[in-house]
Amino acid sequence: MIIGIGSDLIDIRRVAEVIERHGDRFLNRIFTEAERAKAERRAKNEKMVVATYAKRFAAKEACSKALGTGIRHGVWWRDMGVVNLPGGRPTMQLTGGAAERLKALTPAGHDARIDLSITDDWPLAQAFVIISAVSLATS
């Protein structure tokens, strides 16, 4: 059963402006170490670096909406990180207040699953998050 849906659309140029203005202070406040490492591996192409950050920013916004909190009520930027599953599919890894909120949303006898779709087409980046409760009972 679906327990949360969130989406976000962001102008990649806005993210570029914020990075230009605030640099590491912004990057350290918003992104996990794994997210920063992924973006910096694309350092040969500045547009790809910024698009990578923008997609992850949009994913965090979408996830916070799916959690029903936004970026408040104990859910902070670095509590949510985009990671890739072994096959390459992106998902969200939650810690801290975001993980606590997810646990509170998940009904007893269920596990939470977070599905994430991220994309970019200059100058826009988009993310869509669906949080589902999957029954632990076997068929």
Curated annotation (Swiss-Prot):
EC number: 2.7.8.7
Source domain of life: Bacteria
Coiled-coil ranges from the UniProt annotation: none
Binding-site residues for Mg(2+), renumbered to this chain: 8, 61
Catalytic activity: apo-[ACP] + CoA = holo-[ACP] + adenosine 3',5'-bisphosphate + H(+)
Cofactor(s) needed: Mg(2+)
Cited Gene3D superfamilies: 4'-phosphopantetheinyl transferase domain (3.90.470.20)
Localization (cell): Cytoplasm
UniProt GO BP: fatty acid biosynthetic process
SUPFAM superfamilies listed in its UniProt record: 4'-phosphopantetheinyl transferase (SSF56214)
Pfam families with a match to the protein in the record: ACPS (PF01648)
Gene Ontology MF terms in the entry: holo-[acyl-carrier-protein] synthase activity; magnesium ion binding
Entry annotated with the keyword Kinase: no
GO annotations of cellular component type: cytoplasm
Keywords for the protein's UniProt record, in alphabetical order: Cytoplasm, Fatty acid biosynthesis, Fatty acid metabolism, Lipid biosynthesis, Lipid metabolism, Magnesium, Metal-binding, Transferase
Role noted for this protein: Transfers the 4'-phosphopantetheine moiety from coenzyme A to a Ser of acyl-carrier-protein.
Family: Belongs to the P-Pant transferase superfamily. AcpS family.
Protein name, UniProt field: Holo-[acyl-carrier-protein] synthase
